[in-house]
Each structure stands twice: as C-alpha cells, then as structure tokens.
Amino acid sequence: MVKRIELYQEAAKRMAISPDACMEQIRRCSISSKFGYEGTDPASLAAIVGMDADWGAAAFAELRSTGFIKTDWARFKWYQPSGKELDDKIAELAAIEVAAIIRLSSMDCAPALPSIRALAENLLEEADGGDTIATSLAHNRMMLAIVSATGELRLMEDYVKHASVAVAYAVADRLEAADLEGMKRSANVIVDLIGTTEPRDCAAEAVAMRLHPREPVNA
C-alpha cells in the first residue's frame, strides 16, 4: 500500500507544467517537432536556452524521466510519436482506466471520492482557461487518482509506465476548443458515477475522453 501511494504521489507531482520557464519551453518545442529528429544531449539542451552545463545535465535527466527524451540504440532522441503510436498509447491508457472504473464499482471507494472530485474540478478550470496542455495534465492527474483508488499496485505501475508527462503533452498537441468542452462534460459524468454499481456509462465517458473527446457519450 505504501509503495502504491508513493508511486501515485510521485506521478501526480510530475504531471504538471514545469515551474522552470526554460524547461517548459523545451517541453513544448519538443512535442511540436521543432527539434526535428536530431539527437540531443545535456550540452545541446543548455545551448538551446542559453543555460550552463549544470542546468543542461539536470534538464537532461528530468526530460528522460518524464518521457520527452528516449534512447534510440546508441543515441538519445526526442519523443515524437507517429499518429498510430500515439493512438495505441491512448488506447492503452483508456483500457487501464476502464479496468479501474469497473474495479471501483465493486468497492467502497468513498475515501477517494473527495480527491477525485477536486481533481475533476481542476480539470474543468483548466479547460475553461483554454490551455490544452494544462487540461491534458489535469485529465491525467484525475485518472491517476482513479487508478490509485483501486488499491492495486500492479495496475498502478502499468498505468504510470504508459501515462508519462510527454504523452500528456503529445495528446494536448491534438486538442482543440471543442475537445475541451467535451472533456468537461465527460468529467462531470465520471465524478457523478464513479464507484456506483453501474460502471458502464462511467467507463464509456472515460473512453470518450481519450478516444473522441469532443463527442462525449452523454452530450
């Protein structure tokens, strides 16, 4: 239980816009393909934003841990998934989220509901603000709480493996205003139904938020 809680807390803390403006600039540029398919290293990172070697080393480690930099044989490269690769990743996340929602329908998850509702409220606020990255991160924080509420360490480990910060940014790069409105409607349904004995509609909205956010089930 302690390991699961620590895993959740660490993942949720990471799932946020960087407080370092230079780091945030690099995150956004990498996902929007402004760096192309070139390799990267600490020195080149520091050069991009005019920082020193220590900053470059720390930034390189942080970008690797959050999924923005991947290992490609003997070099490091930016995470720039193809459309299919991102579709597959989104489907994996949706499948785990559905499994968690179904599991919670047979549990007493009342202790987790205040936190889930607060995170849903945060998602609504971010969506109202129109920032797709902030909304995508808020979506992931809400879903992290839902998966964690099952109490299943293996499910949580699997989810954290797929739900990287870089994936949240890549998803955000696809989102438009209509998607944010749909996500708000789905989030409201999810918090109303999570933990009830009829999880089908709740699970369907979770899938909608991932696969077709502008078309919620209960539009």
Task: For the regions a language model picked out, list residue spans one by one.
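Short linear motifs at protein or domain termini
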Residues: 1-106, 217-219
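Short acidic alpha-helix initiation/capping motifs at coil-to-helix transition points
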Residues: 3, 134-138, 181-182
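All-alpha effector-binding/dimerization core of bacterial HTH-type transcriptional repressors
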Residues: 19-22, 29-30, 40, 79-145, ...
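Short, hydrophobic secondary-structure boundary micro-motifs
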Residues: 38, 72, 135-136, 155-159, ...
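Mobile beta-alpha loop/short-helix "lid" or hinge segments that flank ligand
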Residues: 65-69, 162-164, 180
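Hydrophobic, amphipathic alpha-helical faces that serve as interaction scaffolds
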Residues: 92-105, 140-177
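Short acidic/histidine-centered micro-motifs embedded in hydrophobic/aromatic stretches
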Residues: 119, 161-165, 205-209
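C-terminal all-alpha effector/ligand-binding and dimerization domain
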Residues: 171-219
